[in-house]
C-alpha cells in the first residue's frame, strides 16, 4: 500500500502511460525499461511555498504556490504555470508527468515540469493580479533560470501575467534572460506563440485525415470544447482550411451551431473579446444560428460530426460522451487539452479502433496532438539564446514540421511495438506514449539516473 496521499489526476496519467507500455511488446523486448518507469514516475524536485499578497482593500491574502520539476534528462524543465482555484499537487504532478513525454515528442531539448497556484484571477483587479504575480515570483525566481527551468503560461496565465512575472524576475535576479516563454514580441517573445497549440492541433489532425484516406478538412464538421487560446485559434485555422466549427464551450455551458453554417470568424472574434475581459460565454450575444446550452459540454448536443477536439480541461470527455460521439459519426478525436478524455472514454475509442478497423474512430492523445504550444515555446527559447527573431512564416513552417514528426513518430512506434490486425489503424496513444517514454528513459540511462544489473 502506498504511503502517499491520494493523487487521482496523477494516478490516472501514470496508469494511462503504464497500461499502454504493458500492452505493447516494449517490456518484452526491453524488460529493463520497467525500472526506468518506476524512477521516471517520481519528480526530481517539488517546490511548495506560500504566496502572501495584498488585495485592493489592504487585506492580507495567502495562496499556495507550486513548481513540480519532474524530469531534466532532455533539457531544462519546461511547462506552464496555472492560476486556478482547483490547482493542487496532484493536478500539477499529472500535468508535469505528461509534459515530460510531450516535450520529448517535439524533438527539442526540453525536460518536463509544471507549476502554479490556487489563486483565482477571475474577479480580481489588474493591480491585484500584478501584486499576486510579483509575490509569486518573489519565491519562484530562486528555482528557475534559462538553463534550469523555463515556465510558460497555462490556464489563468496569459501575456499580462507573464509580463508581470518576467518583470519581477528581472528585478529580483538582476538579469534579462529567456526565463519565461509567452513573452511580448518587443521583449523576447515569438510570433505564432499564442496560436501555436491550436494551429498545431489542426496540423496534427490533418495528418490523421491524410493517412487514413479521409482527405482534407473541406466539408468536415468539427466539434470543439473550450473557448480559450487553444479553441480560439484551432477554430480560426479550421475555418481557414474549409471545415465547419459547430461548438465552443466554457465552464458555464456550451455554444452550439443550430444550422449548417456553423460558428463564424466574427463569432470567434466576439468570443475572444469576451474572454479578454475575463467573462463567461453567457455574455455572448448569439444570433439565430447558435444556441446556448446551460451547464453542458457540447459532445451530446452537436448532432453529426466528423471530428471532435476537446480543448478545455482534463477529463472533459466521459465514457457516455465518447459513445455519443461514435453514434454521431465521429471518426477522429484529438486532445487539445491535457488528458481531455477519461480512461473509460479512451477505452471506448481504442476498442472501436480495433473492432471497426478502417471504419473506426481514431484517437490521438494530448501529449502528441497538443505539443505545438510547448514546441513554439522551445522555438522562443532558441530565438532568445541567439538574440534574434524569426518571421511568422519561419515559425509556422517549423511548427508544421514538428507536428508532422510527432505524428509519424507515434505512428511508426506503434507499428513497431503494438500488434495490429490487418486493416487496423495504428494506436496513436500507444505509439506516442512509447516513443516519448523510450527517448526519456534512454537519456536517463545514459546519464546514470537508472541502470541495469550486469
UniProtKB/Swiss-Prot annotation:
For this UniProt record, give its keywords in alphabetical order, as a comma-separated list. Acetylation, NADP, Oxidoreductase
One Pfam family name is: ELFV_dehydrog
* Record-linked CDD domains: NAD_bind_2_Glu_DH
Q: What is this protein called?
A: NADP-specific glutamate dehydrogenase
The record's subunit annotation is:
Homohexamer.
Q: Tell me the organism.
A: Neurospora crassa (strain ATCC 24698 / 74-OR23-1A / CBS 708.71 / DSM 1257 / FGSC 987)
What are the protein's GO molecular function terms?
Answer: glutamate dehydrogenase (NADP+) activity
The UniProt catalytic activity note for this protein reads: L-glutamate + NADP(+) + H2O = 2-oxoglutarate + NH4(+) + NADPH + H(+)
EC numbers listed for it are: 1.4.1.4
User: In which family does this protein belong, per the annotation?
Assistant: Belongs to the Glu/Leu/Phe/Val dehydrogenases family.
**Biological process (GO) annotations?**
glutamate biosynthetic process
Q: Which residues form a coiled coil?
A: none
Active site per the UniProt annotation: 114
Amino acid at each position: 500500500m502506498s504511503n502517499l496521499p491520494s493523487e487521482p489526476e496523477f494516478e490516472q496519467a501514470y496508469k494511462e502511460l503504464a497500461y499502454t507500455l504493458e500492452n505493447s511488446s516494449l517490456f518484452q523486448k526491453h524488460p529493463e525499461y520497467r525500472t526506468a518507469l518506476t524512477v521516471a514516475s517520481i519528480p526530481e524536485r517539488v517546490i511548495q511555498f506560500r504566496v502572501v499578497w495584498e488585495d485592493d482593500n489592504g487585506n492580507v491574502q495567502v495562496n499556495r504556490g507550486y513548481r513540480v520539476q519532474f524530469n531534466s534528462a532532455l533539457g531544462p524543465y519546461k511547462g506552464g504555470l496555472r492560476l486556478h482555484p482547483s490547482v493542487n499537487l496532484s493536478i500539477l504532478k499529472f500535468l508535469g508527468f505528461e509534459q515530460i513525454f510531450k516535450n520529448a515528442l517535439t524533438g527539442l531539448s526540453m525536460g518536463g515540469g509544471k507549476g502554479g497556484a490556487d489563486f483565482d484571477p477571475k474577479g480580481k483587479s489588474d493591480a491585484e493580479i500584478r501584486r499576486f504575480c510579483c509575490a509569486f515570483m518573489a519565491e519562484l525566481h530562486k528555482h528557475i533560470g534559462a538553463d534550469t527551468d523555463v515556465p510558460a503560461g497555462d490556464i489563468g496565465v496569459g501575456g499580462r501575467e507573464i509580463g508581470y512575472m518576467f518583470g519581477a524576475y528581472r528585478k529580483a535576479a538582476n538579469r534579462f534572460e529567456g526565463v519565461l516563454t509567452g513573452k511580448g514580441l518587443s521583449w523576447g517573445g515569438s510570433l505564432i506563440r499564442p496560436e501555436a497549440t491550436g494551429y498545431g492541433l489542426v496540423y496534427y489532425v490533418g495528418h490523421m485525415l491524410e493517412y487514413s484516406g479521409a482527405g482534407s478538412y473541406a466539408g468536415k464538421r468539427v466539434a470543439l470544447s473550450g473557448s480559450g487560446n487553444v479553441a480560439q485559434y484551432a477554430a480560426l485555422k479550421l475555418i481557414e482550411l474549409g471545415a465547419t466549427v459547430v461548438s465552443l464551450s466554457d465552464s458555464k455551458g456550451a455554444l452550439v451551431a443550430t444550422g449548417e453554417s456553423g460558428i463564424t470568424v466574427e463569432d470567434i472574434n466576439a468570443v475572444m473579446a469576451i474572454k479578454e475581459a475575463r467573462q463567461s460565454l453567457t455574455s455572448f450575444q448569439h444570433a439565430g444560428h447558435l444556441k446556448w446550452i446551460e451547464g453542458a459540454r457540447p459532445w451530446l448536443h452537436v448532432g453529426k460530426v466528423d471530428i471532435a477536439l476537446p480543448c478545455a480541461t482534463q477529463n472533459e470527455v466521459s465514457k457516455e460522451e465518447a459513445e455519443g460521439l461514435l453514434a454521431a459519426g465521429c471518426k477522429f478525436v484529438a486532445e487539445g487539452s491535457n488528458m481531455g478524455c477519461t480512461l473509460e472514454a479512451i477505452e471506448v475509442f481504442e476498442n472501436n479502433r480495433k473492432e471497426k478497423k478502417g471504419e473506426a474512430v481514431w484517437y490521438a492523445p494530448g501529449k502528441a496532438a497538443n505539443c505545438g504550444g510547448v514546441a513554439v515555446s522551445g522555438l522562443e527559447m532558441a530565438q532568445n539564446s541567439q538574440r534574434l527573431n524569426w518571421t511568422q512564416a519561419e515559425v509556422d513552417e517549423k511548427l508544421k514540421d514538428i507536428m508532422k514528426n510527432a505524428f509519424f513518430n507515434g505512428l511508426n512506434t506503434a507499428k513497431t511495438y503494438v500488434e495490429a490486425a490487418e486493416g487496423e489503424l495504428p494506436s496513436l496513444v500507444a505509439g506516442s506514449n512509447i516513443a516519448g517514454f523510450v527517448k526519456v528513459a534512454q537519456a536517463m540511462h545514459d546519464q546514470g539516473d537508472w541502470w541495469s544489473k550486469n
